[in-house]
């Protein structure tokens, strides 16, 4: 199995007031080109999809466009986790629908113990969590 591991997309990031959305779109095109060229079986996004927990509307729209292209049009399964900059509650709102399209997004610790299987390979997606969440989960 071949997969492309990415992380820290930080969609919506501004650098000293300069909007990076155009650069982020270009980076996504490069990620998609690599996925196609290498004929990967899945794309991993290991946290920090957005730059802040309440991203700007434009950042959400751009990320949606990216996932429609990668997952629905190009048919790459996407394995993603929330990072410390993401709001797990906001990200998980489409969870049941996402899984039907092979867009797997884990945002809570308890989800990490349920494997996602692609081509007889199991993935365990461990999202960012606060230490208190682990203590409460394992008590």
Feature map (PLM): residue ranges:
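His/Asp/Glu-rich metal-coordinating catalytic cores
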Residues: 55, 82-139
């Amino acid at each position: 199995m071949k997969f492309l591991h990415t992380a820290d997309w930080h969609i919506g990031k501004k650098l000293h007031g300069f909007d990076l959305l155009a650069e982020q779109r270009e980076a996504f095109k490069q990620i998609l080109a690599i996925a196609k060229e290498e004929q990967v079986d899945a794309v991993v996004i290991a946290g920090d999809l957005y730059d802040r927990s309440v991203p700007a509307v434009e950042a959400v729209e751009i990320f949606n466009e990216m996932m429609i292209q990668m997952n629905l049009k190009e048919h790459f399964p996407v394995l993603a986790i929330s990072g410390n900059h993401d709001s797990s509650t906001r990200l998980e709102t489409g969870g049941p629908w996402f899984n039907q399209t092979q867009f797997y997004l884990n945002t809570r610790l308890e989800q990490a113990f349920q494997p996602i299987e692609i081509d007889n390979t199991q993935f365990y997606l461990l999202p960012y969590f606060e230490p208190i969440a682990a203590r409460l989960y394992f008590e």
